[in-house]
Design a protein with these regions (language model features):
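Bacterial N-terminal signal peptides
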Residues: 1-11
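Early extracytoplasmic/lumenal segment of secretory-pathway proteins
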Residues: 13-100, 109-110
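Solvent-exposed loop/turn segments at secondary-structure junctions
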Residues: 36-39, 70-73, 91-95, 128-131, ...
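Alpha-to-beta junction loops
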Residues: 80-86, 143-144, 211-219
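Periplasmic-binding protein-like
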Residues: 115-120, 185-192, 199, 231-258, ...
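Ligand-binding pocket segment of bilobal, Venus flytrap-like solute-binding proteins
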Residues: 173-240
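Extracellular/periplasmic juxtamembrane helices and adjacent flexible linkers that interface
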Residues: 256-339
Length: 339
């Protein structure tokens, strides 16, 4: 069903005074998202979708939203908040919502298998890069003070762990033809010994670093670009690791909280997220489009990654393997507990 047809269906579902005049308070969409989705949604995506509905069908669309670490958002929904849509940092959180009975539809049937945008993981350092940090492995050097979000509450933190561990696996395979999991583990252990603060979300970690704490921060590329954009004189440089992961972010409908009347509204908004108009807005906020590579070329600040990889790389195995085998068995059991 096209977006125009969906919007027309919305009008048909509304009481006539509302659909014809735009009065009566309009239609509300409640969205919960992981922390870095706040700016593009509130400043661009929401206003653009609402304007489209008003212009083409005289329907008033309003949004209510809340943003936190992906694990926190997922827990809030599981505990009963009435979110209708969630945009999450990691697919595992979407799986948790499905297992809890909150998501009954298959988000993989959405465009791009439900992945609405992506961004690589990078390292932020202070101007001049005084600690000579050029790759994840440099974060293992003695004396480095690393800010890192908390893997218990932050999906971004879990992406960061996969970035550090996975980059060593891929580098070792390029060096010797075989992945060296011992080397990857030892590097991750050495890096984690240098962590001095674990804020609850990627956005809180960025704030901690902005306030002058630590020598380095592992985060989404877009967060570094937003810092620089907000303050060109900010004490920050972006280090692009030669090998790093592209985080991919699923959008899901919380079916349990969507009424029959609201369904056309939600479906129209979900489809809109993958439109060129919305994808271009994500790119303006330094995400990368999942639908059209040409849109990514419009943002000249997006870095070229020499050896990008995703969670679905055979050495990582997708989230069904990455979480139990790397996040739990490697990080929690052999790194975090032994720090």
């Amino acid at each position: 069903m096209s977006l125009l047809v969906m919007l027309a269906t919305i009008g048909a579902c509304l009481p006539k005074p509302l659909s014809e005049s735009g009065g009566g308070g309009g239609v509300n969409i409640t969205l919960y998202g992981f922390s870095i989705m706040k700016e593009p949604l509130e400043k661009a995506i929401y206003p653009a979708f609402a304007a489209k509905a008003k212009r083409e069908h005289n329907i008033d669309i309003h949004f209510t939203s809340s943003f936190a670490g992906s694990e926190t958002v997922t827990n809030q929904i599981l505990q009963g908040v009435k979110a209708q849509v969630a945009i999450l940092s990691i697919e595992r959180d979407a799986d948790r919502l499905k297992q809890g009975g909150f998501v009954t539809s298959d988000w993989h049937l959405l465009p791009q298998q439900g992945i609405v945008n992506k961004t690589p993981f990078v390292i932020l350092v202070h101007k001049g890069n005084p600690k000579s940090i050029h790759d994840f492995s440099d974060l293992a050097k003695p004396g480095i003070r690393l800010i890192h979000p908390d893997p218990i509450s932050s999906g971004g933190a879990q992406w960061s762990i996969l970035a550090m561990y996975g980059s060593e696996l891929l580098k070792s395979k390029r060096d010797s033809g075989t992945e060296d999991r011992t080397r990857a583990l030892q590097t991750l252990q050495a890096i984690w010994r240098n962590v001095i603060s674990t804020p609850a979300s990627a956005r809180e970690a960025r704030t901690t670093f902005e306030l002058g704490n630590g020598d380095a921060l592992i985060t989404y590329e877009l967060d570094g670009l937003l810092m620089r954009q907000g303050n060109p004189k900010a004490d920050v440089e972006i280090v692009i690791p030669e090998t790093t992961i592209l985080s991919e972010h699923p959008a899901v409908v919380i079916d349990r909280n969507v009424s029959v009347v609201d369904r056309p509204v939600i479906n129209a908004f979900m489809q809109y997220l993958w439109s060129d108009e919305a994808q271009r807005e994500f790119v303006k906020f330094h995400f990368r489009s999942t639908t059209n590579e040409a849109l990514n070329q419009e943002n000249k600040e997006l870095a070229t990654i020499k050896y990008p990889f995703t969670v679905n790389d055979p050495l990582i195995g997708g989230w069904s393997r990455a979480y139990p085998e790397i996040i739990e068995a490697v990080f929690r059991d052999q790194v975090q507990k032994r720090k």
